[in-house]
Curated annotation (Swiss-Prot):
Gene of this entry: lacZ
Residues at which substrate binds: N104, D203, E463, E539, Y540, A541, H542, N606, W1002
A Pfam family this chain is assigned to: LacZ_4
Protein name: Beta-galactosidase
Source organism (scientific name): Erwinia tasmaniensis (strain DSM 17950 / CFBP 7177 / CIP 109463 / NCPPB 4357 / Et1/99)
Gene Ontology MF term list: beta-galactosidase activity; carbohydrate binding; magnesium ion binding
GO CC term (a single one): beta-galactosidase complex
Transition state stabilizer, annotated site positions: H359, H393
Amino acid sequence: MAKTDPLTLQQLLAQRHWENPALTQLNRLPAHTPLASWRNADAARGDLASPSQRLLDGEWGFSYFDRPQAVPDAWINGDLPQVGRLSVPSNWQLSGYDAPIYTNVQYPIPTDPPRVPDDNPTGCYSLTFHCQPAWLQSGQTRIIFDGVNSAFYLWCNGEFIGYSQDSRLPAEFDLSQRLLEGENRIAVMVLRWCDGSYLEDQDMWRMSGIFRSVSLLHKPHVRLDDIHIDTRLSPEYRSAQLRVLALCSLTDASAYQLKVTLWRDDTLIAQHQQPFGTPVVDERGRYLDRTRLSLQIDQPLLWNAETPHLYRAVIALLDADGTLIEAEACDVGFRQVEVSGGLLKLNGKALLIRGTNRHEHHPDRGQVMDEPAMIADILLMKQHNFNAVRCSHYPNHPLWYRLCDRYGLYVVDEANIETHGMQPMNRLADDPSWFSAFSERVTRMVQRDRNHACIIIWSLGNESGHGSTHDALYGWIKSDDPSRPVQYEGGGADTAASDIICPMYARVDRDQPFEAVPKWSIKKWIALPEETRPLILCEYAHAMGNSLGGFSRYWQAFRQYPPLQGGFVWDWADQNLTRQAADGSSWQAYGGDFGDMPNDRQFCMNGLVFADRSPHPALFEAKRAQQFFQFQLENTSPITLGITSEYLFRHSDNERLCWRIEHHGEQVAGGQITLNLPPEGTVSLMLGELPSLAGELWLRVEVIQPAATAWSPANHRVAWDGWQLPAALSLPKPDVPGEQPRLHPQSQLIEVVQAGQRWQFCRQSGELIQWLQADKPQLLSPLRDLFVRAPLDNDIGISEANRIDPHAWAERWQRAGYYRLESQLLRLQTDILNDGVQIRSEQAWLADGEPRFLSRKCYRINRQGEMLLEVEVDIAAGLPEPARIGLHCQLAEVAEEVCWLGLGPHENYPDRRLAAEFSRWQLPLGALSTPYVFPCENGLRGGTRELTFGHWHIRGDFHFSLSRHSVEQLRKTSHRHLLRDEAGCWLTLDGFHMGVGGDDSWSPSVDEEFLLRARQYRYRLILTRG
């Protein structure tokens, strides 16, 4: 270690290392792949705990200051009187110090690089520990910080050790010359902001502290410093080479050898041993401190996300007598990644990326992710047909990659670089003074993670424009690791710094011709002249709140056009944080809820799953669209089903097809067939004859996995589909004789009476204001037209209280007066018919005295006690398309169960219903609402033919929702925990409902076919006593 002058704390801080982009570290050791220094080769092979490692996680001393200069010099040598305790790893903001800040683009500090505010929150950590005596006698003892945000200084026993920044990569220091017998004390001063913060402008919560593990590692004096693993496959993929490069600290290269053994479980596959030194490199000779060797492997089991076969390589450093000095080990997956023929290929097969972006986020622990949380994410991804994850937007915890290797996920490893808030975005990427800061974040990532089979693409970072620095770093990666492609979206997604066209939020068919960086439709992009690269969307389908509409269109395009090789949904999990209320209850917070300024409100909640990893309904849509089995109904007489496997590498040796025919939602036929399909195989199966039944006749199929797997339980469902079958001709049912309804006009209302039922209509509004069954009122509010919804995030767009987006749906509806409509009755007419009573009304809905909608209703109450309701709605010209054409009312009864025949079981909307199935469903009332943290329209079920709830039974072809919360309350409430159950239950019955959109959430993204563009709509319902 370079000797450092004994500066006082204030003298050291006066140098302001944290504002110098050319200086990113002092005394930090070079980056390398993870090491464990086993002293037993069998322990290395078994991945047992290494006695050379010691974890320092736990309770540390902690003192908080508003700026580094406020820290007393005495703290370096001993804890201060007011010292507290803080868990490591953690973010200090979640323990009551300072506040987390959520912003997307805008920097949370004034934009003045490389300077940061003088008021720079500072956390002072300390820990005392005893060091093993043997470690003091020989060798090297290192301390490793896996993640510290954003910069820190380190002291050991009062002596300055070093400085580091880059929150997401390890910082490693040599403590050997500073450790003492007995008690040792390390002190770590962490700064919230540094010049590196300008490179970490990711869309996430800005939090600080030691948020990943801290450990000690003892290495012998002669030691392995780094191991590079590379696998090469033969052209026919039947044999492979395992190439190993070992870098060592040696006193005499001739006295040491390297031995590599490759294992498959307990079976030795290959081994090789050779002395150190390389062939001559140039006119100055060769390397003496490194060696390269190669093992030939015949018929290797290849790694891929479907069958993630792994071997274990043990790299042993031996002395001249063959005695083990130390061993390192790592998992090895034999696979080959390439871009050839315009396609991204793995082991010769063109991949279809079923991907998601994932932040390291936990609602209670912030940016601290432990192994159970990581495994839970991986299992959920695999269970929902994801095969890839992009580490957005920084290198993840080192354990994440080992788990992805073992469970099978393709990974895009991304450098911790984003300068989204700069103007222009590429300002720092084109500034030579920042080159070193950029470079270390890319090169150190590659040096740490290169041995992982799961990593198939390197990424130069996110949303940082395109500058000369990107071109240089692209070249460095291609030279240092030619085994993987490189991608980078900045500067237009198709610059020379990317092997893959990797746009974000490009539409399927619509161009977005932005100045300088046009975003073409994905179909057009791959057809551009001279473009030969594959296209993989680095971000698409912005899953913010009630979203993901139109997702299936992307997958139709991916399957139709081979160069469109999938993409990564934005994003995996909502990034809200848990807060405690005064009464001890907890609630979920988003931007601004900690008093953080600036903030971007709920824009942190874009997940397919809630922060606690319970699913959004959109997750099921993604699972269905991405499923690995495709079905085609080839014939209905007899019923013949075609099945195609989209697995590229695995046989369907654990799959069973289950099929059933349902009549009005009840099974009338079914069966099971074991599937045995080769990769990419197809089969046609005859299921049986078509039943001769009238009415709703549906075929439903699903593929399950009978046996549990590493990532799923037994009988896990992997794919499904359904079709309406041709039904026999049905004859009208003869009317059942019943009591003739009677009309009872009154001064304020019109009442119709029939066999214990009474319907009451208001003479002033023409609306049904009460329905009594056996004298029991059913309504707490009239059955009334409804044209609005509580705005979705996609409806709000980029509108804020002080910045209105005039194109956002919510603003257009607001300007048109849809949320403040007043009713005017134009006509009310009653008629006595041969088989009942008819009431006709014509009602205008006005805003500012101007008509917006004209609603004509015909209520026909017959002898069977049914109310046939026909609704016709006209929309005034020149107005925005409404969210819905429907009815709503407040029911008096709150029944426990809801039963319906229609699409379900989960929430679905016209442009997000691929995953919904037609059947007869029954759920508790509370299960019908989706608890989005930011309240909005939710819980709709479409394609409904029948609905039964309490004493209500409704037939027709409609959408419905049932909720304890009105549209008005949802619209005006900022957080889920602030919603209050209202009296009764709100029922909405929609004849028509617009889509939710979801290509992005800042521009109108509902496809034309899912907008209510017609000027007139008609629908029909039948309401009867349940």
